[in-house]
Amino acid sequence: MAIVVGADLKGTRLKDVVKNFLVEEGFEVIDVTKDGQDFVDVTLAVASEVNKDEQNLGIVIDAYGAGPFMVATKIKGMVAAEVSDERSAYMTRGHNNARMITVGAEIVGDELAKNIAKAFVNGKYDGGRHQVRVDMLNKMC
């Protein structure tokens, strides 16, 4: 499993904080960030890398998290969530089988961002009754 990270200009500093934290925690991290990219291009790059292996997860950071979330939900087979707290990050893995989260650098600070990333990557899909909802989401794109 690899954690794919990406950010636009407004999210780059926080992305580096999260990336370094995940590396310290022992995760393989793939950074697809390129200078000058818009959040649309960054989100598409993260999703492309996430979709190479069904175990991969993605984190996109921009100023508010909303833009990358809108992009991610347009990608066939991608379940994504915009999160700003640890519980939501954890639960979106467990109940929605989300493979990507988006975070706003102007919404959360460094420590919260690290906790969000940790909760997300350590979350496991519960399956069962939640699969009906995941199937419904996957039929939409």
UniProtKB/Swiss-Prot annotation:
Enzyme class: isomerase
GO biological process: D-allose catabolic process; galactose catabolic process; lactose catabolic process via tagatose-6-phosphate; pentose-phosphate shunt, non-oxidative branch
Expression induction or repression: By lactose or galactose. The operon consists of lacABCDFEGX.
The EC number(s) this enzyme carries: 5.3.1.26
Source superkingdom: Bacteria
Cysteines joined through disulfide linkages: none
UniProt-recorded Gene Ontology molecular function terms: galactose-6-phosphate isomerase activity; ribose-5-phosphate isomerase activity
Keywords, sorted A to Z: Isomerase, Lactose metabolism, Plasmid
Catalytic activity: aldehydo-D-galactose 6-phosphate = keto-D-tagatose 6-phosphate
Pathway note: Carbohydrate metabolism; D-galactose 6-phosphate degradation; D-tagatose 6-phosphate from D-galactose 6-phosphate: step 1/1
Oligomeric form and interacting partners: Heteromultimeric protein consisting of LacA and LacB.
Cited PANTHER family: GALACTOSE-6-PHOSPHATE ISOMERASE SUBUNIT LACA (PTHR30345:SF5), RIBOSE-5-PHOSPHATE ISOMERASE B (PTHR30345)
Family: Belongs to the LacAB/RpiB family.
Comment field (misc): This gene was sequenced from pMG820, a laboratory-derived deletion of the naturally occurring plasmid pLP712.
Name of protein: Galactose-6-phosphate isomerase subunit LacA
Organism: Lactococcus lactis subsp. lactis
Lineage: Bacteria, Bacillati, Bacillota, Bacilli, Lactobacillales
